[in-house]
Amino acid sequence: MERTYQYAWIIPFVPLLVTMLIGLGLLLIPTATKNIRRIWAFPAVLLLSIVMVFSTKLAIQQINGSSIYEYLWSWSITSDFSLEFGYLIDPLTSIMSILITTVGIMVLIYSDNYMSHDQGYLRFFAYMSFFNTSMLGLVTSPNLIQIHIFWELVGMCSYLLIGFWFTRPIAANACQKAFVTNRVGDFGLLLGILGFYLITGSFEFQDLFEIFNDSIINNNEINSSFATLCAFLLFLGAVAKSAQFPLHVWLPDAMEGPTPISALIHAATMVAAGIFLVARLLPLFIGIPYIMNIISLIGLITVLLGATLALAQRDIKRSLAYSTMSQLGYIMLALGIGSYRAALFHLITHAYSKALLFLGSGSIIHSMEPIVGYSPAKSQNMVLMGGLTKYMPITKTTFFLGTLSLCGIPPLACFWSKDEIINDSWLYSPIFATIACYTAGLTAFYMFRMYLLTFEGHLRSNFKNYSGHTNSSFYSISIWGQEGSKPVSSNLLLATRNNNDKSSFSSCPFSNTYKIAGYVRNMRSSFSTHFLNKDPYTLLYPHESDNTMLFPLLILAIFTLFVGCIGIRFGQEVMEVDILSKWLTPSMKLLHQNSTEDWYKFVTNAFYSVSIAYFGIFIASVLYGSVYSDRQNLYLINSFAKMGPKMRIRLEQIINVIYNWSYNRGYIDVYYEKVFIRGIRGLAQLAHSFDRRVIDGVTNGVGVASFFLGEGIKYIGGGRISSYLFLYLACVSIVLLLVK
């Protein structure tokens, strides 16, 4: 056992070999390296698999009761100051290491085929391997200085991969947005680290926790306001990294990178880094009640905000991005209420489910690109999808499992962890628990909206006369899945027929004069005629992805089905302590858990949350499944036609407000644009004007004045007698005038 811990230092550095070898190959033998580029996927997967095996062995030892292991190497800078580097192995480290390596391996296998035709294939694998190295270094760090070093490396790799296709202006702007937003959090993190060093005189976690809790909390040796400020600055770094409100704005734009990296960022690396930091520092935060309240409040706001912003997105990856934001809010909420176990449990289950969904979306995008084009505005647009079930059955099945898991449907993984968070929230605040519970219904709604628009009904991209441009009225499917051609009725629950049209559309909600989209009106009667023209473009259909892309989906689907078993807690009378609780025992000794093991209460609370989730699924099925399926009658929808005109208008107004809020990202980006970006640019222009007119004016004025003064003196002393006589007579005249 001791030998295993002694060699744990290799964990971060093994994947680094791939980056170094690719770099040396491109430097020394570039032609040969590029010719055999597909071979580099094998060592990348192999080396990360070695780390996974090693991490699994460490995890087994932790579960079997091993203590925390730390190794430090001191680097003396002066006689009074030294930095220590090393590694820390504890339950949190082993959990994160397994998460990073398992998800990372699946993403690398998937990427081999997904990126095979990209010119940046080698660069992609070099970045990915370095990304894994940086994240593994972060989770094994024993102190704040080492954390900060790898924290910056994780951010750098994220920026490189978000802007991987840097020749596209949108990707370059997304990279800059992620960089600038995270700079705010990283600056706060650095100030917080320096502040706690000033308080405790140490960067080491163990020393930091002991000194702070014993000497400061108990003896009141430091100003509590200053300690709270430093803790908030540390938390600010996690807010930016994990895309929590209000520094979440970079996350949807980060979808401009390749889809495999989106899966890795959202499941196990970039956004998980902020959660890891809060979990690592929780023994410190838990002694500062104000910070715990702030953490839980920020988490709750993010839960609700992310869910509402996902409601009306058309881009499949951006919908998943807002879903990630909301689910990370659940984890942050759990950490804020002191439910350490539930937070890590949901981090695990969400990672596998979200990786499955992102890789599934990549499979969908990969199959749609030959049909609609390679622009993300089209290939990622759910408006152009539909009916993919018969073309991509394996992708559909795995995506469906991931969707059910994220909706919190038992017995899939996320059900157990999410409901444990909601259950523990009741102990902290009924208001928080109620909001978290009802947000589960929103999650179920937008996830099934995504699933139904993508897989159910008919393939909409092959309809003749279809335009994929955003200014096309056909394009504008709203939150409720219908045409958006009129400003008042653009967001109706379902498009309805024109009164001049004698035919009837039985499942429309309102019988009024709003014009139905032609593709919906003719869907059942003349669907096949849309595919009868001879244009070869319209004869294209999606196809199932290759085996190397399907294999990771199937493995992640298995994880999604069964990984929840590690944390199922029935209570001592029914079953022994679950695996996750045994795993976390050394870490949980440092914390006061705010959780309950009452199985009856868990089932009762789970019944409410699952019922709300099923209600969200039902509403999504009503609003989306009825339009794009072959069902002829849906009496619930038809009942809306009986409402009076005032009620319909009021309902439309409410829907418009919800749609506009969601589609426009809650107007937060607009606010930042007007207040911060334009404000900073205005200040920059003012500073530039002041510099040009005042600073440069004074400097240039002195130079010009010196020039003319020199020219004048040169002219006077130029050796001309007439000038001397004129100057002499002028001086004599002045003297005579003064004398008189």
Curated annotation (Swiss-Prot):
The record's subcellular location field reads: Plastid, Chloroplast thylakoid membrane
Which key words are in the record? Answer: Chloroplast, Membrane, NAD, NADP, Plastid, Plastoquinone, Quinone, Thylakoid, Translocase, Transmembrane, Transmembrane helix, Transport
The organism that produces this protein has a lineage beginning with:
Eukaryota, Viridiplantae, Streptophyta, Embryophyta, Tracheophyta
Tell me the protein family, please: Belongs to the complex I subunit 5 family.
Give the organism, scientific name: Nuphar advena
Outline the subunit composition: NDH is composed of at least 16 different subunits, 5 of which are encoded in the nucleus.
As its record notes, the protein acts as a catalyst of: a plastoquinone + NADH + (n+1) H(+)(in) = a plastoquinol + NAD(+) + n H(+)(out); a plastoquinone + NADPH + (n+1) H(+)(in) = a plastoquinol + NADP(+) + n H(+)(out)
Return the EC number. 7.1.1.-
Tell me the membrane topology, using the record's own terms.
Multi-pass membrane protein
Q: Which residues cross the membrane?
A: 9-29, 39-59, 89-109, 125-145, 147-167, 185-205, 231-251, 259-279, 281-301, 328-348, 355-375, 397-417, 426-446, 548-568, 607-627, 719-739
What this protein is called in its record is: NAD(P)H-quinone oxidoreductase subunit 5, chloroplastic
